[in-house]
């Protein structure tokens, strides 16, 4: 049984102001979003599109032999239930911990809407068209006193969509290494069954998460194929035929964000477009760049690699080979929500930020903007680490933002014998008691003398701080366990100077705590307040 401890997002270092204002439902963020966390109209299902029966049939074909809960979700969709969607790149062995947090949030929101009388199901969108292999080819698992990185090294020859990469025999020793780190468990069995030679990254990822969230009824979708691109062709066609209009809308939105004191998550360059082209010969995913209209080409030109195309050329490809036209990060949510008729989309801090940009595309292409909801964010505190935190009187807020060295120094300062603490405190207090009146008196005599006095006083305060550091460093040398404790806490709670959810592989926690963890995080992910939760396992 876990214990949840809620914290506002302000305890997390490095989050951008736009995301924080969105989470607090600040008035300044409202112009950029269809819905803020304080709103509830995300539960309203958009109109059922004409392609819905075909879409649900294709979804069912990808979710063959569903669990009872997934079969019930499919049946609800056939009856017109709404969709809460989330998604992620298809990372090795299930990717980082925030991946199941996304799935859990979509499931929790679908449950809430259904309980309120608006039936919904959760769909996990596999970002299989992404071509950043270096982002998905590795996973990090905690090991004894270290973090171990497992890497699938067989890179494709071109920057092709990662979902279609077929696993070769080199995956087998990686699975064996994962087994040594994770130990025997249902999760390890599921991982080994999914990640095997002959499977694609997409198939392996889908199979693992369908198993992990079988009891909750998660449906998994790969929309990279011809049928889905044909179904979503109106969105891709708009991005071709109205490229200049949509580009200017994005430029204008970026300007509005910057004028409001925010940042633009995705840069919009003069020649950038909303589309990629899959090369028919190599399979590489190439950015389509836009060249302005000219006397010779009144509709402008497009360029992918060294090849140039007219708009008519690309419309021809869309008609005959729609799977070769691929949406960018800013267009993908619109393409996705056209297919799914989405009620709400779940995203992390960066995604919520770029939804503020995509909103202008939603308005112009779909005529509506899908509400965005922040995913569940958490740190899982295992029993041994929880004991260390309690022993040293540490909270998440005290650990976040601290390097291992600074954390160790803090533990050592706490461990200084009481007599030493009292003497250091007394010396510091006495110094401050004398310096204040002295520098004030010297300043009253002469301004220049006062400035010199402040400089000298600052140096004296520095030396006092140095005495504290010397005492703490001596204590750290005497008690080596303090350094080991600091290292263990850092690797578990704030590894590599970042949140645990962004680095640790999710499979590690499923292996240690069972697939029952999926239900536990789904239950916690229903909290309507955006924030960061410590889950004490």
Predicted segments, located by residue:
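A translation/RNA-centric and nucleic-acid-associated enzymatic feature enriched
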Residues: 269-343, 349-360, 369, 376, ...
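A glycine-rich helix N-cap at a beta->alpha junction
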Residues: 140-169
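Long, compositionally biased intrinsically disordered regions
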Residues: 31, 208, 212-309, 313, ...
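A structural-propensity feature for long, helix-poor, extended segments
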Residues: 136-140, 380-413
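N-terminal leader/transition segments
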Residues: 1-65, 87
């Amino acid at each position: 049984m876990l214990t949840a401890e809620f914290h506002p997002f302000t305890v997390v270092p490095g989050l951008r102001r736009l995301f924080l204002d969105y989470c607090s439902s600040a008035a300044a963020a409202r112009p950029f979003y269809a819905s803020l966390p304080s709103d509830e109209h995300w539960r309203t299902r958009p109109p059922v599109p004409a392609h819905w029966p075909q879409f649900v049939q294709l979804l069912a074909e990808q979710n063959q032999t569903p669990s009872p809960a997934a079969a019930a979700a499919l049946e609800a969709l056939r009856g017109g239930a709404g969709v809460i969607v989330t998604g992620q790149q298809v990372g090795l062995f299930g990717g980082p911990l925030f991946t199941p947090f996304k799935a859990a949030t979509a499931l929790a929101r679908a449950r809430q809407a259904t309980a309120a009388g608006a039936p919904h199901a959760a769909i996990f969108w596999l970002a299989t068209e992404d071509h950043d292999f270096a982002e998905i080819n590795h996973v990090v698992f905690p090991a004894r006193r270290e973090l171990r990185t497992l890497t699938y090294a067989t890179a494709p020859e071109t920057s092709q969509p990662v979902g279609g990469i077929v696993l070769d025999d080199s995956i087998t020793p990686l699975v064996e290494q994962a087994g040594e780190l994770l130990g025997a468990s249902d999760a390890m069995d599921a991982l080994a069954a999914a990640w095997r030679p002959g499977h694609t990254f997409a198939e392996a990822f889908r199979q693992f998460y369908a198993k992990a969230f079988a009891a909750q009824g998660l449906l998994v979708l790969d929309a990279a194929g011809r049928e889905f691109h044909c179904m979503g062709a109106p969105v891709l066609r708009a991005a071709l035929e109205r490229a200049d209009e949509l580009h200017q809308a994005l430029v204008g939105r970026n300007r509005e964000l910057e004028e409001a004191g925010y940042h633009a998550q995705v840069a919009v360059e003069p020649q950038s477009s909303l589309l990629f082209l899959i090369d028919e010969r190599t399979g590489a995913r190439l950015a389509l760049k836009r060249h302005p209209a000219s006397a010779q080409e009144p509709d402008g030109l497009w360029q992918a690699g060294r090849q140039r195309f007219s708009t008519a050329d690309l419309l021809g490809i869309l008609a005959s080979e729609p799977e070769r036209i691929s949406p960018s990060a800013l267009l993908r949510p619109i393409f996705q929500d056209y297919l799914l008729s989405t009620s709400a989309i779940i995203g992390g801090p960066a995604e919520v930020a770029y939804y503020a940009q995509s909103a202008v595309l939603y308005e112009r292409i779909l005529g509506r903007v899908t509400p965005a909801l922040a995913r569940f964010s958490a740190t899982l505190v295992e029993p041994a680490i929880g004991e260390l935190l309690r022993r040293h009187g540490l909270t998440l807020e005290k650990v976040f933002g601290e390097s291992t060295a600074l954390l160790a120094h803090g533990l050592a300062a706490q461990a200084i014998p009481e007599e030493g603490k009292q003497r250091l405190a007394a010396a510091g207090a006495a110094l401050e008691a004398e310096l204040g009146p002295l520098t004030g008196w010297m300043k009253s005599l002469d301004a220049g003398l006062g400035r010199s006095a402040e400089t000298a006083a600052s140096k004296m305060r520095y030396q006092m701080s140095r005495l504290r550091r010397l005492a703490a460093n001596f204590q750290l040398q005497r008690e080596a366990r303090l350094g080991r404790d600091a290292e263990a806490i850092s690797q578990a709670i704030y590894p590599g100077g970042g949140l645990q959810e962004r680095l640790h592989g999710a499979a590690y926690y499923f292996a240690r705590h069972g697939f029952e963890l999926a239900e536990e995080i789904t239950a916690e992910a229903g909290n309507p307040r955006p924030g960061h939760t410590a889950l004490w396992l």
